[in-house]
Amino acid sequence: MNIRKIAELAGVSVATVSRVFNHPERVLPETRERVLAVTREHNFTPNWFARGLTLGATKTIALLIPAIDSYFSQNIISGVETVAGNKGYVVLFCQTHGDQEVEFDFLKLMKTRKVDGIIQVQSQLSETDFHEPLSLNMPRVHIGKNQDCGCHMVCYLDYEEAAFRLVKHLLTLGHRYISLLYDDKRDGELADEMESGLKRAGREAQCEAHLSIFRAEDSAQGGYRAFQRMVQKGTIPDVLVTAGDLQAIGILKAARDGHISIPEDMALACFNDSPVCSVVSPAITSVEMPAAKLGMAAARLLFDSIEDDTRDPDILQEMILQPKLKIRESCGNKTGIFELFV
């Protein structure tokens, strides 16, 4: 069954059947119903991809994201899907694992799939990394500070401000030596932002703060193993700040197994707040990053560009979202208030 057969059985032209599918308001109600009755009788489904090519829009967008298993990533996905769903679009998810080659291959694939736009999350690419010509004549938004990937629309979370607020709190508790545990495949910008925030907090507090960097997989197992290595080497930090909540959970488990008390022996904080941070013991001081709002902001930027083809694609559009510090017990806070919002 195809569109020609439908036209023949309904006693109309192929053009009329096409209008029923693409512009039903232009077809007389009785004619429209006759065509639809034939499609129902023969269980005919239009080829929406071919229809999209004809109309110049496939009603699909792509989301290229390093990982889909973290609470942070899931919130970005939720935000993007909310906006896309309201627009009647389908989202194609592409997990890059922070790998440049994988990300580049997905870009090529999305070009052949004729998606209407692409959102890239924490892209590891720069245009100089394109080892073969790749002309992407479609709107693209990048979630992250990296503008070298060729996106002229960017939105990101202010990690430097998040680091400043967190370190400022740690300094008031008397901590001076801070260690950061992050996954360089997923959190490439975090180390530099942490260092900038730490220096600004130190200047404001008129004291010197020191930063050490450690790397581990962004998972509970990654945090557990990383802390075990620290214990074995006798390098337990004064304060350990993790990039992800799962790493922090793994560290809590490793500390308990090693009879190390938090916060008495070591303070613990994380950059990615999640519901679990408030229910473990001790509750983990963390930075709430509005990831769902970030996904929604990126999607809105993308659809504004899709719907307005008069916009100059070379003009940079930048949107920055601010963090919120949630002070709990894991860093030594002694106040009677369960949770502070700074």
Model-inferred region functions:
Residues 1-59, 342:
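N-terminal helix-turn-helix DNA-binding module of bacterial transcription factors
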Residues 3, 14, 32, 46, ...:
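A general structural signal for well-ordered alpha-helical segments in protein cores
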Residues 14, 32, 58, 77, ...:
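ATP/adenylate-binding site constellation spanning eukaryotic-like Ser/Thr protein kinases
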Residues 41-47, 101, 121-123, 252:
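Short gly/ser/thr-rich secondary-structure transition/capping motifs
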Residues 56-168, 172, 231-232:
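Alpha-helical recognition/docking segments in bacterial nutrient-uptake
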Residues 41, 82-87, 111, 135-142, ...:
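Bacterial carbohydrate/catabolite-sensing allosteric modules
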Residues 1, 22, 26, 30, ...:
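Residues at secondary-structure transition points
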Residues 14-19, 53-69, 169, 177-184:
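Short beta-strand segments enriched in small/hydrophobic residues
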